[in-house]
């Protein structure tokens, strides 16, 4: 249970091992000053070993910096005279007030001067042919762009594109749609997700075609919708993630080729949005959403800080195991284990050794704000024996992934705050452990290890800090301490509802299950079991089988780790308590 300080995703997606010529990239921009997330893509391309910036096309029809604003009364009079702007006035006022809620140091829409990043890149200043919201490129500009023999054009500017520009690059014009295109088409980005209470806010990368929202969807990423009433905050994670998504697909194109990229495109699906096209909200719509939202926040404000999240673990023996169930899951029969004052217990794992089942878990020390790893014997009656501390570092540890191999017991705890993936071996099980090797210097979260058919598999989650973990990557090696090989099916998931690991993979009755967290409604909200259907060095497929939400036990607000060993099951749960009662 931790949030890493940095991300390895940028460095991973800057390096390709394929022996192919570098991708020739063109950029469509509205000017040298671009949002921070765009600047990040430009920087990553420039620092990659597989792509080259060959051309920049500046939109000379883009809005220019606004002249000095008129006094407020004059602006109000001008707005109120227009019936259309009158209907939308409240949203404009809301945006001005909400702008101050954006993060000061890491706003992905903050303007960045990209001129230094683009120094030396050929530039075209282009006046598009404008018709309504549509832009077409003049024939002479098309000829010049064709001369660059571009592989991909990345659209960060201009309006809706039509005409020959869509065909001039070998693999088309790639464009980001800031929303999940299966549910939200139109705009403004990330407002309607808040308005409708959508659990996730997405970003979609597509290859543009003549038909709006009908391009080839190369990929999408889904982030938790930020609770509350701030679009400025809700947009941050998806915009940051859009830069990662674009680099991931460019990397995939170079590493594996166009046919592979095209085969992994997301197939068309029926549009499920409540509106055909979302538009700027009217005054009535803003008021209908904003007033009750603010009122609810005001009512809850006096209680903020009175309750704090507190995690515990629970055991069940002899019940119908979760893997054998379908939705809705039956979680009856679990018994909670109380934590001593000053501690919480979470991230439980089970292992059988010498006829005894042991539980390993994160033992969080409130006084030091860090986790250590503790363990206890699972008693025949379903409780735990004495809790014993078994692994401690001067940095936070959690998610004690314990497993056996060739008679030894190993552990890979999460140590993302140290920027490492560490392998420990038990020298005197269960309480004495020795660092065997630092497997990777990556800020991987909740690394889950699996051994099958002579190969080792490492499932690791990553974040775009300071955002949540929405990216699951799979690596494999020919030995436990061998070199990690990036799996071609990566990313396994870019969905906050199923990316992050939620416990050890297990095999029962010939079926393999990977537990995964659902963080859409808040950190550690729920979890699911996913049956692994295909696992080879070339392919990976899984399917969800059963999901668990915190409603299974009164008072829970989260439940995010599950383990199974024989007839014993273990789970954790989070509830809100008075801090004075547990610290």
What is the role of each PLM region?
Residues 344-353, 398-405, 446-452, 504-508, ...:
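Structural signature of eukaryotic scaffold interfaces centered on beta-propeller domains
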